[in-house]
Amino acid sequence: MGCCTGRCSLICLCALQLVSALERQIFDFLGFQWAPILGNFLHIIVVILGLFGTIQYRPRYIMVYTVWTALWVTWNVFIICFYLEVGGLSKDTDLMTFNISVHRSWWREHGPGCVRRVLPPSAHGMMDDYTYVSVTGCIVDFQYLEVIHSAVQILLSLVGFVYACYVISISMEEEDTYSCDLQVCKHLFIQMLQIIE
């Protein structure tokens, strides 16, 4: 097999998905975004499973990866809708943190060009509340950075889905050929035994 096969391409794509998911996982941990952390963790596990299935010629593992990519695309479309506030969703809710904390996206305060300034608390507030943090000068708003992350994940998943389907179809054809070869060998072996007798 040459290096430009669908299998090699899927291996490279899975490796790229792992790097991308790990990068996203780090920034979600920094922002205490528990729902995306859980999703990224599951994604990393399934991509490793798909990578293993591709390397070891295990089409069932690749099928699990294929089903997961459809779910992963759905999750990332939801994240895009969440940050763009489509369909009644609001990026200012605590949905991504499971309503555990008031943390938001790490990019909200640390995006490119952002200047973070802590304002003095009022008499009624507490210092750890995010309403006392002022962020100015951002080159790109945080919600667009999150949308870009999700769009990259969708693109990688869609390409991965196509390659995974291709590798599964090739694997199934090879299994059919192999089982046919076994039947031919069995038939020839029986004929040889009959000739010897």
UniProtKB/Swiss-Prot annotation:
It is found in: Cell membrane. InterPro entries: Na/K-Atpase_Interacting. It is a multi-pass membrane protein. Keywords: Cell membrane, Membrane, Transmembrane, Transmembrane helix. GO terms for biological process: regulation of sodium ion transport. Belongs to the NKAIN family. This is Sodium/potassium-transporting ATPase subunit beta-1-interacting protein 3. The lineage of its organism: Eukaryota, Metazoa, Chordata, Craniata, Vertebrata.
